[in-house]
Amino acid sequence: MHQVDPNLTRRKGRLAALAIAAMASASLVTVAVPATANADPEPAPPVPTTAASPPSTAAAPPAPATPVAPPPPAAANTPNAQPGDPNAAPPPADPNAPPPPVIAPNAPQPVRIDNPVGGFSFALPAGWVESDAAHFDYGSALLSKTTGDPPFPGQPPPVANDTRIVLGRLDQKLYASAEATDSKAAARLGSDMGEFYMPYPGTRINQETVSLDANGVSGSASYYEVKFSDPSKPNGQIWTGVIGSPAANAPDAGPPQRWFVVWLGTANNPVDKGAAKALAESIRPLVAPPPAPAPAPAEPAPAPAPAGEVAPTPTTPTPQRTLPA
């Protein structure tokens, strides 16, 4: 008989116990691992691999830009409107717009002065005032150029002493009235007035002639300068204009309706030719106001009553006194 080694039995028992313990531990680990895995976060999605995808022929769309608010469309533009042509005609005016103000050609001019003595009216030039013309032998209106404001209220302003304007009717006091045409009358008037106001030796220079039109009434003007022999004197200047209609040949024609303007100046205070022309063309005949209407006829007095219808005047009987016998 074989004798069993007691140590071998004990070793086998120990090995069996160790094997049982190892199996129990393995089962515990197998059960615990799934529980621990379920508590972890979800795994990240797999990264797509571009290498495996086929190349695309279409370009990728660009990233959207930041949106910008479009400008407000013009009122007259349409969605399909083309750019405007710089050479195109301007659009027609709005038919509902108010028309521009129309200035009447015969509108009264500002600061208009009536001259009853000469029978005309005129527009006062800017910067000029009317002066006293009572001591003048020729003309009925005298204008002076102001050089400043009046020193005190109610007093006339200071005026220049080297320039003046004379206006009046071209009557028989002036030799120029005998000239049949306005151009000859203006030249004659300029020559006579030049000798009267500038009686110094000299030479006439820079002579001019200008046509005038005063609201349909024709006229003419003459201008020249005088270079005096005395070099200390500034050149004199004179502008003369005649406007109106000369006398007609008809026996029943009225007096001639012609007026004149004489503008005197110097090189230090020259004649304003444009203002002189405007002054002459502003002359208008002074129309007398219409006569006052005749008074209405008085109501007739009532007719006297017929004689048969006159009521008798009551009379009081005179008392009679009886005398004693």
From Swiss-Prot:
One of the entry's Gene Ontology molecular-function terms is:
extracellular matrix binding
- Ranges of biased composition (kind: Pro residues): 61-74, 88-103, 287-305
Note the segments forming the sequence repeats. 85-88, 94-97, 104-107
Region (Disordered) location: 38-110, 286-325
Signal peptide positions on this chain: 1-39
Report the GO terms under cellular component. Answer: cell surface; extracellular region
Note down the stretches annotated as region 3 X 4 AA approximate repeats of [DA]-P-N-A.
Answer: 85-107
Does the record's keyword annotation contain Signal? yes
Q: Where is the composition biased (Low complexity)?
A: 49-60, 75-87, 306-325
- What's the main place this protein lives? secreted
Keyword match Secreted: yes
Q: Which Pfam families match?
A: FAP
- Biotechnological and industrial applications of this entry: Major immunodominant antigen that has potential as a vaccine against tuberculosis. Can be used as a DNA vaccine in guinea pigs. Apa-ELISA could be used in diagnosis.
Give the sugar-modified residues.
T49, T57, T66, T316
Q: Where in the cell is it found?
A: Secreted; Cell surface
Query: What processes in GO biological process is this protein linked to?
Result: cellular response to starvation
| UniProt keyword terms in alphabetical order | Glycoprotein, Repeat, Secreted, Signal
PTM details? Answer: Glycosylated, with mannose residues. The secreted protein has from 0 to 9 mannose residues, the majority have 6, 7, or 8 mannose residues (22, 24 and 17% respectively). Deglycosylated molecules had a significantly lower capacity to elicit a DTH reaction in guinea pigs in vivo or to activate specific T lymphocytes in vitro. Pretreating mouse macrophages with mannan decreases binding of M.tuberculosis. The non-glycosylated form stimulates IFN-gamma production however, so glycosylation is not essential. Runs as 45 and 47 kDa protein, the nature of the difference between the 2 forms is not known but is still seen after alpha-mannosidase treatment.
- The domain of life for this entry's organism is Bacteria
Annotated family = Belongs to the Apa family.
Q: What does this protein do?
A: A potent antigen in animals immunized with live bacteria, it induces a strong delayed-type hypersensitivity (DTH) in immunized animals. Elicits a mostly Th1 type of T-cell response in healthy humans; induces IFN-gamma production from CD4(+) and CD8(+) cells. Functions as an adhesin, binds to mouse macrophages via mannose residues. Might interact via host CD209.
Name listed for the protein in its UniProt record: Alanine and proline-rich secreted protein Apa
Q: Which gene encodes it?
A: apa
